[in-house]
Amino acid sequence: MKPVLALVGRPNVGKSTLFNRLTKSRDAIVADFAGLTRDRHYGDGRLGEREFIVVDTGGFEPTAESGIYKEMAKQTRQAVAESDVVIFVVDVRAGVTGQDHDIARYLRTAGKKVLLAANKAEGMLEGIQLAEFYELGMGEPLAVSSAHGQGIRSLLTAALEDFAFDEPDDLALDDPERPIRLAVAGRPNVGKSTLINTWLGEERLVAFDLPGTTRDAISVPFERNGQKFELIDTAGLRRKGKVFESIEKFSVVKTLQAIADANVVLLLLDATQGVTDQDAHIAGYILDSGRAVVLAVNKWDAVDSYQRELLQRSIEQRLAFLKFAPVLHISAIKRQGLGPVWKAIADAWASATKKLATPVLTRVLLEAVQFQQPKRAGAFRPKLRYAHQGGQNPPVIVIHGNSLEHVTDAYKRFLEGRFRCHFQLSGTPMRIEMKSSRNPFAEKDS
């Protein structure tokens, strides 16, 4: 699982700027699940080969008792609870404040590793400016500048030093001994645990009729028709007889971690509620992660034909970016429609890991060009010459030629459709990369 770093601090100390720096994004919202995260934003970061999740929070006032500040404090406490490391951000230029002391007092009781990031430290005499921050009792302040990128690598190195990162898997992607890691993802109460319980034939995961009653991701070994699986319930496990209250029961972090750790994601939708913003955000993250995906609409038996038609349109419109994914209709509680789900999952993984021969790719490419040439860009028309596979899971197809920087997105989608049709690829995203010759006259037309 990817480690989780939570950014905590009072308002206007530069947390969002640091978030953008760590995630190499100006967007500050990589996975903002509407209605669930409010003032918590989630993004992916990387230091070399080490990947992690960053949680950005709103300004933290631990003693707030009402209004928006109380809600923001609640959100921040939840971010701390689901994190592995807390990065406590302070403002060097403003010095230590009473709010900083309040936050430090809270963090000392949180039981988490805490790093003190002294932000806005560019161009300052660090020893003099940082000395006062020792009084917070958070250890040595680490001087950083979110705006200028100074000290970021040292901060991340300290944050990640205690984590063992997974070594590359020695088993080939198509090795029959390799289990397919399947993440069952979706909003609270769409039936994730019920579906897995039905598959396993036992209450291995405790399912209650209440949104979000499971908590931490759990992996369950499973075998069907000779194929090994590892099922991941992204909401997680709540053990029988152990009752606890969570500030917010649906854990976005666990969902993101499970998706990142999976080979195939089964995205579960609720037929009685249609496609929501939360569904679309989760689907978008799955696509960005490059994971194979199957859509399953649960509680299909609970809606009439008119509602089914509306739902189909909603899926086509709101999840158009997942049009490559098969859509299946099921009832987990009644065990209806579950058989085809397994075939779709196996097909999606087979498609994601399929080996595509260069001669066949090139033939399909040239046939597509003969059927429909790319549009001219001024005096030049892009010349597509040959293609080869650049990667698996998801499939990457690299196309070589001249003036390929002028190939439109629409034409790339056309080519993707031709490749998908020929190789019968279902349930996996596909990436097409264009590589032009440096000299447009280096290769003569054949």
From Swiss-Prot:
Keywords: GTP-binding, Nucleotide-binding, Repeat, Ribosome biogenesis
Classification via CDD domains: EngA1, EngA2
InterPro entries on file: G_ENGA (IPR031166), GTP-bd (IPR006073), GTPase_Der (IPR016484), KH_dom-like (IPR032859), KH_dom-like_a/b (IPR015946), P-loop_NTPase (IPR027417), Small_GTP-bd (IPR005225)
Annotated ranges, domain EngA-type G: 3-167, 180-353
Binding site for GTP 1: 9-16, 56-60, 119-122
One example GO MF annotation: ribosome binding
KH-like domain segment(s): 354-438
Transmembrane segments: none
Binding locations of GTP 2: 186-193, 233-237, 298-301
GO biological process: ribosome biogenesis
A UniProt-annotated Pfam family: MMR_HSR1
Role summary: GTPase that plays an essential role in the late steps of ribosome biogenesis.
PANTHER family documented for this protein: GTPASE DER (PTHR43834:SF6)
Quaternary organization: Associates with the 50S ribosomal subunit.
Sequence similarity: Belongs to the TRAFAC class TrmE-Era-EngA-EngB-Septin-like GTPase superfamily. EngA (Der) GTPase family.
NCBIfam families, per the entry: GTPase_EngA (TIGR03594), small_GTP (TIGR00231)
UniProt-recorded name of the protein: GTPase Der
Species of provenance: Methylibium petroleiphilum (strain ATCC BAA-1232 / LMG 22953 / PM1)
